[in-house]
């Protein structure tokens, strides 16, 4: 009998990662396979810029996973992240007739209005409900409360439309069904942060190769999300000014770089080896690394809204490949004046695996493991024999794909969960919203006509002619009654 499993793919700037695993009854995860493909030639700053090469990477990952699992893959979970993702607050106001009791339908209406907001060249990926203002008070759950003025405050997560469209195009061209798209920063946050950190207020910093992602939580709610185009590769590029090749500069960074070196520990006579024939002055090397690290840290801290900078009682949590640099936590403490800094080397879930990429706990697999943890639909297809594999590995990753597993859902049910609607889902939601809007307009038109008829009737009844005729009829009736 074919085994069930979940497949997730992370589209990173340095590498694209595919993972297959199973979720156990005790909440743990068993990893069955992991595959990596170099993506530097098709993804920059977390954004797809070469669709054809991205399709090739995706196809290769699926083929390798199928080969390892000896089983078809019907659909995959996908992480969405990268440059230009940002959050923006939006307030929707609704005045109520008199003192009205707030219903869930009213809340859904606010969510629908917010979801249908348009921004130039931007796509709303998700919206995190911040709170509701009821008259002059703020509430998280306003249903059942009586008021005359209601405001919904939302944090919209925006991304460039063409970036969003490129992801959908790549998976369509590669014939891979998407089970669900998730905001990668939110999926990872749910796997590396504790509930107490989110409630107390914390700053999560994912130090990646091309980008640094900053998420701010307070009272258990996402309050800010931004991606800055700075990462570990910027340090590598700066080091090339000392004449090493890119590959050598990367190796030197991984071997020698520290985020901070006490000046008393710098030996001006010490040189770092590039290869057997070349060396670089350690002092210059240290100066370059520290300058770029400081720039990244300062820019990350600058992303935190002023209203939350003094509310981070849960501290700062660092993750991603850049968090492995020695003394990186010290630099964050120095620049933010926050002493509580934790490096999240691994997810909070129990993960069973023998793969060194996972067991080494470097923080570089946290996002894809977070995506895997989010999965709740089977991605496994039929089993096949090795003899048949060559004929099967190029089949479309569909069949019993996402549509066969996924039940229709209300878009409002996914608000704030990190779920990103696919292009097909978004189109369906827009059509449903249009039908609903047309129905409401028709109902409003009929109601207006009915009210107009009733108003005309009232005016007619109150007119002088009508009053005279009623009086005359009454006079005639009374006269006849007296004669009888």
Language model features with spans:
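Phosphate-binding glycine-rich/basic clefts of nucleotide- and phosphate-handling proteins
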Residues: 67-68, 82, 156, 161-172, ...
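Residue-level signature of catalytic and energy-coupling elements of molecular machines
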Residues: 8-9, 18, 78, 171, ...
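Extended, folded domain segments that form the structural surfaces/walls around functional sites
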Residues: 99-104, 198, 206, 302, ...
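Glycine-rich phosphate-binding loops at beta-strand->alpha-helix junctions
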Residues: 80-81, 258, 312-335
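A general structural motif
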Residues: 208, 292-301
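Nucleotide/phosphate-binding catalytic cleft detector across ATP-hydrolyzing
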Residues: 1-15, 19-202, 259, 307, ...
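A short acidic Gly-Thr/Ser loop motif
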Residues: 9-15, 80-81, 196, 204-211, ...
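Glycine-rich phosphate-binding/hydrolytic loop that grips phosphoryl groups
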Residues: 344-399
